[in-house]
Amino acid sequence: GVSTACLYPRLLEESVYDLAVNGINHIEIFVNTDSELKKTYVSNIADTLKRFEVSCRSLHPYTCAMEPMMFFSAYERRIADVLEYYKKYFNAMNILGAELFVFHGNKSLLQIPCELYCERFLKLYETAREFGITAAQENVSRCSSGSLSFMKEMVRNLGDKAKFVLDTKQAVRANESSFDILRTLKNHVVHVHISDHGEMGDCLQIGKGRFNIKRLLEILWEESPDCSV
């Protein structure tokens, strides 16, 4: 599939329409602001998806930058408030038919014990499950999750509730191997953001860099065949 973020800064509804009329059958929706979570707006997006027979697998929130403060500070009331706000995303996802919620989490500079991190993540995970949705941790280079060792600790603490989004460009930025991440986390990886990279940059169109995408897909098929890309 293709993310609406690929067409940023086009308005979300225009991005969805453009992808649909160009034959993209599967998309990820990147919400850019609060008004795009209103029921009438989301319902209109859902109508476009239905009209063109497009499925929406995942949703990416616009509030990632707030997650360190709202989920991982010492001020616990923030957690209750942010979980209540995130229900707006989950309600929107139910209308859209989306199943995966992409989570960035804490900044690596604001280190907290992994056990506490997992405790807070679990609150999000369980809230999402009330809506039939899976919250998945993305390997963002500037965040705690940019480290494969940290993600391994999440698996150790959370077991089957540790789900991940692998972003290949973020792995490059964190000096991690996408292949190693897949080999290590296996079917805990439920979604992949894939792009090419090489001398011209770390986020290129597929075919414009030197990344062995064929090998990545082979490993993905071996380790997590139900994963979406």
Predicted regions and their residues:
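Short loop/turn segments at strand-loop or loop-helix junctions that form parts
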Residues: P61-C64, H104-N106, D196
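N-terminal pre-domain/capping segments
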Residues: G1-N94, R129, D160-K163, N187
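Acidic-and-aromatic substrate-binding clefts and catalytic sites of carbohydrate-active enzymes
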Residues: A5-L12, F30-N44, K107-E115, S141-S147, ...
